[in-house]
Amino acid sequence: MSVEELSKEQVQMLRKAFDMFDRDKKGYIHTNMVSTILRTLGQTFEENDLQQLIIEIDADGSGELEFDEFLTLTARFLVEEDTEAMQEELREAFRMYDKEGNGYIPTSALREILRALDDKLTEDELDEMIAEIDTDGSGTVDFDEFMEMMTGD
């Protein structure tokens, strides 16, 4: 898929993911975060393919990608998937952690999900991501917050 083929919703989702990892709001992310972002978005890929593409797109070898470069790179890995099917998969994943069926999961469960998606995340990175998602500090994440985090919607 090319950047031109991305829907407005996909670009918004990727912007949200990019911003989540651009913690200092410098306008770029480090190339080592790309695989984490792709996994968070539920994309599968060969690590070697990703590294080769990063080398191509990060031509100056700075290890930093601006949003347009990130968009070019991630567009190649995005699989066109029915939005409803993706939402259903996420709903199912949420239900697995919402053991009591009360409509929310503790942030500790969210931490497990994020760690499962990328085992290279540090405790500080996990804390920052959870703080961004659990904006009211309740220690829980409801399905809407979970969906917003996972899809940018």
Swiss-Prot record:
Decide whether keyword Metal-binding is in the record.
Answer: yes
Instruction: Show where the EF-hand domain sits.
Output: 9-44, 45-80, 85-120, 121-153
UniProt keyword terms in alphabetical order: Allergen, Calcium, Metal-binding, Muscle protein, Repeat
* Cleavable signal peptide: none
Which residues are noted in the entry as Ca(2+) 1-binding?
A: D58, D60, S62, E64, E69
- Which InterPro entries does the UniProt record give? CALM/Myosin/TropC-like (IPR050230), EF-hand-dom_pair (IPR011992), EF_Hand_1_Ca_BS (IPR018247), EF_hand_dom (IPR002048)
Cite a GO CC annotation.
Answer: myosin II complex
Check the record and name the SMART domains matching this protein.
Answer: EFh (SM00054)
Q: GO molecular-function annotation terms? A: calcium ion binding
The residues that the entry says bind Ca(2+) 2 are D134, D136, S138, T140, E145
**What's the family?**
Belongs to the troponin C family.
Question: Briefly, what is this protein's role?
Answer: Troponin is the central regulatory protein of striated muscle contraction. Tn consists of three components: Tn-I which is the inhibitor of actomyosin ATPase, Tn-T which contains the binding site for tropomyosin and Tn-C. The binding of calcium to Tn-C abolishes the inhibitory action of Tn on actin filaments.
Q: What is this protein called?
A: Troponin C
- Species the sequence originates in: Tyrophagus putrescentiae (Mold mite)
